[in-house]
Amino acid sequence: MKLFAKTTLAIAGISMASMAFAADPLHNTTWQTFDEGKPKGVVKITESNGVLTGTLVDTNSAKGKKHIGTTIIKGLKADGGGKYSGGTITDPEKNKTYKLTANLSGSNLALKGHLGPFSRSQTWKKK
């Protein structure tokens, strides 16, 4: 009986630990970005140690091609319930960096960039 109890506790502990370290729902996802309603680029989001980054992997803009491979989202962290904060997003064409909050809802990622008293919102679609 003691062996059964120890085995059960060990399995439960391993299961709980693996759930705690499960990847974020944004990890390894690809998103179509939009600017003023028009498709602009494609960003791949990855997670490492609880921190999300987003890299530009494609663009519809001829002048934006030079920015492919650029990390535009840095330091974003999950707050729970599909909400994210603490990161930054950079517009590589304007060379401006904004504080970032985001909200994941199904196949939509609503982002809001803040620069001083100003803010700008975009909704990206999961590819």
Stretches found by the model and what they are:
Residues M1, A22-D24:
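Absolute protein N-terminus
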Residues M1-A10:
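Bacterial N-terminal signal peptides that target proteins for export
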Residues A17-A20:
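N-terminal signal peptide c-region/cleavage motif recognized by signal peptidases
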Residues P25-K99:
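Central antiparallel beta-sheet cores of small beta-barrel/beta-sandwich binding domains
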Residues I73-A78, G116-Q122:
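Short, surface-exposed, charge-dense and proline/glycine-enriched linear segments
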Residues P92-S121:
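Short, exposed beta-strand-loop hairpins at the edges of beta-sheets
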Residues T123-K127:
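Short beta-strand-to-coil "C-cap" segments at the C-terminal boundary of structured domains/repeats
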